[in-house]
């Protein structure tokens, strides 16, 4: 088995007359934390959205686990083994933390969300298993004591953790995190870093978009940098940190 989990080749994306991505190629290896950084408007979120099926690509191809990834929709991408969180938290506020995770888990069930409503014996047994798994994931991210709380009543940091738990419920091979530290205080950011390090320790591959450059440089195994839709660097943090193009485009002194 190759150690490359995701390979993007010459990805292009236009919005009207704007070339948002220009022949971007990169590789993400199994079991690593891969960071994607760059200034505002560099194309990070666009590339992220291409990988997760929100945007169709205008050129290039994506290989995932050795097979072409069609990227037809977020559902097909999730079924292939890629889960994501969003910069703007997207939870069901009127559902409990446990219920939010259970919704994510239904992607991997035989019955699906609607089948569970029928409540046959098989569906009831499966629903009980989903509930147990949801509780395990809430414990994993450290908010099992809030399982019965409505998502809207959780603290901001706990909502971030809940979104990660829901993504993990789909059993992804690749977890894509979009600005997970945004809005967090210093204590919450430390906890987030420990959680992501735990994911890597347990063998999960993580793609991280994050404006907190120090977090990225201290956490990621490798980092790619985009600028004006082009990749200008891809290497281990120490090499990227000292790259003159990167310093000029984005980092300045913030990575030191």
What are these regions (language model features)?
Residues 2-256:
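Glycine-rich phosphate-binding loops of nucleotide-dependent enzymes
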